[in-house]
């Protein structure tokens, strides 16, 4: 939630998230192809699968909430996109890494600068602290800070 609108929306929808037993993965407000997009990524708590009915119910509640708030937190035209973060969900915040570790799945990590000769690694999170993670790969252990990670996603194998 890199901006003020996303932070405000996150705060506004928190009661809806809690009432519907959901997990707020991320909120972003960006410009895409000339159009403003408010994107809200939600999931079920406890590693359960979210359904389209869950997303539809939440979307209706968010629409009703945003239509009644004065002053309007987003006075310009925008598209509302509410969805699951997906199986290959982005790992953005430190708690996302905790979630990924608990899932037992591998993650894919791309670094800004190569680690041990490679910019991309796949493995399981062994440890997490407030500064970074320890990633166990098939061949070695990589220790890194969150600041060194360019992008990380869950690597769910079906």
From Swiss-Prot:
<comment type="function">
    <text>Required for maturation of 30S ribosomal subunits.</text>
</comment>
<keyword id="KW-0690">Ribosome biogenesis</keyword>
<dbReference type="GO" id="GO:0000028">
    <property type="term" value="P:ribosomal small subunit assembly"/>
</dbReference>
<dbReference type="Pfam" id="PF17384">
    <property type="entry name" value="DUF150_C"/>
</dbReference>
<dbReference type="InterPro" id="IPR028998">
    <property type="entry name" value="RimP_C"/>
</dbReference>
<dbReference type="GO" id="GO:0006412">
    <property type="term" value="P:translation"/>
</dbReference>
<dbReference type="InterPro" id="IPR035956">
    <property type="entry name" value="RimP_N_sf"/>
</dbReference>
<keyword id="KW-0963">Cytoplasm</keyword>
<dbReference type="Pfam" id="PF02576">
    <property type="entry name" value="RimP_N"/>
</dbReference>
<dbReference type="GO" id="GO:0005829">
    <property type="term" value="C:cytosol"/>
</dbReference>
<dbReference type="InterPro" id="IPR036847">
    <property type="entry name" value="RimP_C_sf"/>
</dbReference>
<comment type="similarity">
    <text>Belongs to the RimP family.</text>
</comment>
<dbReference type="InterPro" id="IPR028989">
    <property type="entry name" value="RimP_N"/>
</dbReference>
<protein>
    <recommendedName>
        <fullName>Ribosome maturation factor RimP</fullName>
    </recommendedName>
</protein>
<dbReference type="InterPro" id="IPR003728">
    <property type="entry name" value="Ribosome_maturation_RimP"/>
</dbReference>
């Amino acid at each position: 939630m890199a901006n003020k609108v996303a932070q405000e929306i996150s705060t506004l929808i928190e009661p809806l998230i809690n009432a519907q037993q959901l997990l707020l993965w991320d909120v972003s407000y960006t410009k895409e192809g000339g159009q403003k997009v408010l994107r809200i990524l939600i999931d079920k708590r406890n590693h359960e699968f979210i359904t389209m009915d869950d997303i539809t119910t939440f979307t209706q509640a968010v629409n009703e909430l945003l239509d009644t708030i004065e002053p309007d937190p987003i006075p310009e035209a925008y598209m509302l996109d509410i969805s699951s973060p997906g199986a290959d969900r982005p790992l953005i915040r430190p708690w996302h890494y905790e979630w990924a570790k608990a899932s037992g799945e591998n993650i894919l990590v791309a670094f800004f600068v190569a680690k041990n000769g490679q910019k991309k690694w796949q493995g399981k999170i062994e440890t997490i602290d407030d500064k970074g993670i320890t990633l166990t790969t098939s061949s070695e252990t990589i220790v890194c800070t969150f600041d060194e990670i360019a992008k990380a996603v869950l690597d769910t194998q079906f």
